[in-house]
């Protein structure tokens, strides 16, 4: 048995009780659904209806949508979930990775070009604030990537280090 009071969880007794009660109340299908993270391209109600009637995923990822739609999507997902879901987004360049009104801060290479480590911290705070405002709690984008293939047009601007 996993000790939920120990590292890395450090849960309080009431939180451990919630975990045990929630897990005991889940069907095998609901437990299996927790393994899935579904991509929602447009965050439209019909997408949720289909996915949650069949799969009941433990997480999802939004593509860039207007703020109001992202908030409505988060509320929709939470209302259908027994377990608080993981809601992911690509935030490597800013809050614009989840909502159309989000701030484009810059690629990690641009942040590194400032030669100011504090800029990476400021970027992370801006990304976290904008993403969490619409319910995201999981970033699917590295702040640091290592560019081992200079021909790769994606990782080269997401990288701080070229080797």
Predicted regions and their residues:
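Enzymes and membrane/adaptor proteins characterized by extended Gly/Ser/Thr/Asp/Glu-rich
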Residues: 41-161
């Amino acid at each position: 048995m996993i000790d939920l009071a120990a590292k890395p969880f450090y849960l309080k007794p009431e939180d451990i009780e919630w975990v045990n009660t929630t897990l005991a109340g889940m069907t095998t299908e609901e437990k299996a659904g927790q393994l899935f993270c579904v991509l929602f391209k447009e965050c439209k109600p019909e997408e949720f209806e289909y996915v949650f009637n069949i799969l009941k995923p433990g997480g999802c990822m939004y593509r860039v949508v207007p703020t109001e739609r992202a908030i409505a999507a988060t509320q929709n997902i939470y209302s259908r979930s027994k377990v608080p879901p993981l809601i992911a987004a690509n935030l490597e360049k800013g809050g614009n990775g989840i909502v159309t009104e989000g701030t484009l801060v810059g690629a990690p290479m641009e942040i590194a070009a400032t030669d100011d480590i504090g800029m990476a911290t400021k970027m992370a705070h801006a990304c976290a604030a904008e993403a969490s405002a619409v319910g995201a709690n999981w970033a699917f984008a590295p702040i640091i990537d290592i560019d081992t293939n200079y021909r790769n047009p994606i990782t080269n601007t997401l990288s701080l280090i070229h080797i």
